[in-house]
């Protein structure tokens, strides 16, 4: 079950492959995510050396967060993947013109995981075409309901 979805990613990109990655989080961040106080709409993923990081993910601290901890809502967080997956992703991002986008945050075995997608950007006409398809499907469903 998803905690937070990034629907904008599906609108702006063609998602080719999906991967599940762990996140390196602090305690207050996990509590805030459980409370649904995270935002990944403006987040993006970069490769630094042999590691993958997520930037721009905003986690709003709870009011009850400890006062002796300095909370940084938009700090850079490391993503945890297997070495072979990282190597494959780095190769595709650097050579094939793909990008990495966060798709959602969810729980797996009690831990917060991020689903990331290997994506290619959509052109404006692709977005319009998708919208036309979606509208036609909606209209088709409406017509079927009226007939029945």
Curated annotation (Swiss-Prot):
Keywords: Cytoplasm, RNA-binding
UniProt-listed NCBIfam families: PRK05422.1 (NF003843), smpB (TIGR00086)
Signal peptide (residue range): none
Keyword RNA-binding among UniProt keywords: yes
GO CC annotation: cytosol
Name recorded for this polypeptide: SsrA-binding protein
Domain of life the protein comes from: Bacteria
Recorded family membership: Belongs to the SmpB family.
GO annotation, biological process: trans-translation
GO MF term list: RNA binding
Species name: Azoarcus sp. (strain BH72)
TM annotation in the entry: none
Cellular compartment(s): Cytoplasm
Known role: Required for rescue of stalled ribosomes mediated by trans-translation. Binds to transfer-messenger RNA (tmRNA), required for stable association of tmRNA with ribosomes. tmRNA and SmpB together mimic tRNA shape, replacing the anticodon stem-loop with SmpB. tmRNA is encoded by the ssrA gene; the 2 termini fold to resemble tRNA(Ala) and it encodes a 'tag peptide', a short internal open reading frame. During trans-translation Ala-aminoacylated tmRNA acts like a tRNA, entering the A-site of stalled ribosomes, displacing the stalled mRNA.
């Amino acid at each position: 079950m998803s905690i937070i979805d990034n629907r904008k990613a599906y609108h702006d990109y063609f998602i080719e492959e999906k991967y599940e990655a762990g996140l390196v989080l602090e305690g207050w961040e996990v509590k805030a995510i459980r409370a649904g106080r995270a935002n990944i709409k403006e987040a993006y993923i970069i490769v630094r050396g042999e590691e993958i990081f997520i930037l721009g993910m905003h986690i709003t601290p709870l009011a009850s967060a400890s006062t002796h901890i300095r909370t940084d809502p938009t700090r850079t967080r490391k993503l945890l993947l297997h070495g072979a997956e990282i190597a494959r992703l780095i190769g595709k991002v650097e050579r094939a013109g793909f990008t990495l986008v966060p798709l959602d945050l969810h729980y797996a075995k009690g831990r917060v995981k991020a689903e990331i997608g290997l994506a290619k950007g959509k052109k404006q006409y692709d977005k319009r075409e998708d919208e036309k398809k979606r509208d036609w499907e909606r209209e088709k469903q409406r017509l079927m309901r009226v007939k029945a």
